[in-house]
């Protein structure tokens, strides 16, 4: 049993749940949680088992938005802006996880998506191999990326769609009673994760000044959303509409 990423599961054949990682799918953590707690959220989890990819999904781990951060050199090259706009993305080398969805999202925004192993990200930022990267704010600070990329961009291009995954063969070996215990534990973990992340994110943002981090607000978000239209076009329009509706 482990925490996986919904956006990575299409790599294993579970296409449906990966749609939750589409750019700008949810406006905030509250909407994401509402979806996760709904029948649609359960439908997304059930799709993993139906995909016969070797896993069953027991619950959601609702995390905050993934946002970008850039190095001092990239910031200076952009003219030391006090806010961030879509046109500034052009040509920036942004490290992304090696998933088709994240690569296509960054490319749609005008950046040069650059898949690099997470363990190599700090040195890649430090040496200038990439101009920036993207992640949740807590991971950004916990991994000290702020030391080499102190400019944080509030674009919230997607959310950390964590999923509690279990080996399917192991799941099938459990009794119905044991499966009930696992489902209850997953439900408790999901609730605790949401509360913890919401609190921790605010604490990290409050520490920006003392850590020397500059927050660059995105001022033309509608243009970012429009730029990603082609990313959406490749996927199930009806399911996307249900996910975005907010009526779960």
Write out the residue ranges for each language-model feature:
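N-terminal secretory/targeting leader peptides
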Residues: 1-31, 50-51, 55-248
């Amino acid at each position: 049993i482990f925490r996986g990423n919904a956006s990575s599961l299409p790599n294993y054949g579970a296409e449906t749940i990966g749609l939750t990682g589409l750019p700008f799918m949810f406006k905030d953590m509250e909407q994401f949680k509402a979806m996760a707690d709904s029948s649609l959220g359960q439908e997304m989890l059930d799709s993993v088992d139906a995909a016969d990819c070797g896993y069953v999904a027991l619950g959601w781990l609702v995390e905050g938005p993934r946002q970008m951060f850039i190095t001092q050199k990239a910031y200076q090259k952009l003219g030391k802006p006090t806010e961030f706009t879509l046109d500034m993305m052009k040509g920036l080398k942004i490290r992304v996880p090696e998933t088709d969805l994240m690569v296509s999202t960054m490319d749609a925004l005008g950046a040069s998506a650059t898949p690099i192993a997470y363990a190599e990200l700090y040195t890649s930022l430090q040496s200038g191999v990439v101009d920036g990267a993207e992640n949740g704010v807590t991971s950004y600070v916990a991994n000290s990326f702020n030391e080499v990329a102190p400019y944080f961009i509030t674009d919230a291009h997607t959310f950390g769609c964590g999923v509690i995954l279990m080996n399917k063969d192991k799941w099938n070996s459990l009794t119905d009673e044991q499966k009930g215990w696992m489902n209850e534990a997953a439900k408790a973990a999901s609730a605790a994760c949401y509360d913890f992340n919401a609190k921790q994110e605010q604490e990290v943002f409050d520490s920006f000044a003392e850590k020397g981090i500059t927050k660059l607000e995105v001022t033309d978000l509608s243009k970012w959303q429009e730029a990603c239209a082609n990313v959406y076009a490749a996927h199930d329009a009806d399911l996307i509409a249900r996910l975005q509706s907010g009526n779960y």
